[in-house]
Structures are given as C-alpha cells and as structure tokens.
Amino acid sequence: MTTIRVKENEPYEVALRRFKRTIEKLGLLTDLRAREFYEKPTSERKRKKAAAVKRHYKRVRSMQLPKKLY
C-alpha cells in the first residue's frame, strides 16, 4: 500500500501529484492493467516476443546513418 504524508499548508493538488508520481514509479497501474483480464501463457509469450522484436528494430533503425538529403 502506497502512502504519502501531506505536509502542513500543502495544497491537495500537489499532494495528489506526488501520489500519482509514486504510483507511476512503482508501476502499479501497469501491473493492475495487465492483471485486469486473464491472458493465456502462449499469448503472453507471443506478445512479449513481438515487443522484443519491435524494440530490436527500433534500436537498429536508430543506429543507422541518416539518408542523404541532396
């Protein structure tokens, strides 16, 4: 359970922003969304492999020299 201490004279918007930031750092929302529906192990492996391939091609594309502009 994530808790934050609200300081004296601290606006609630700032406290809410700090709370959202801590939740985002811990990755609780992404974990919650992933567990919202059951995913078969085969489809999970397929999704992770596709993400790895996408990351690989993105890394390769960023390492290529830019095209000549003339």
Swiss-Prot record:
* Entries under Pfam families matching the protein: Ribosomal_S21
Q: Which GO terms describe its molecular function?
A: structural constituent of ribosome
- Gene that encodes it: rpsU
Source superkingdom: Bacteria
Question: Which GO cellular component does the record give, naming just one?
Answer: ribonucleoprotein complex
Which GO terms fall under biological process for this protein? Answer: translation
What is the name of the protein in this document? Answer: Small ribosomal subunit protein bS21
What keyword terms does UniProt attach to this protein? Answer: Ribonucleoprotein, Ribosomal protein
Which family does the entry's similarity section mention?
Belongs to the bacterial ribosomal protein bS21 family.
List, alphabetically, the Gene3D superfamilies matched: Ribosomal protein S8 (1.20.5.1150)
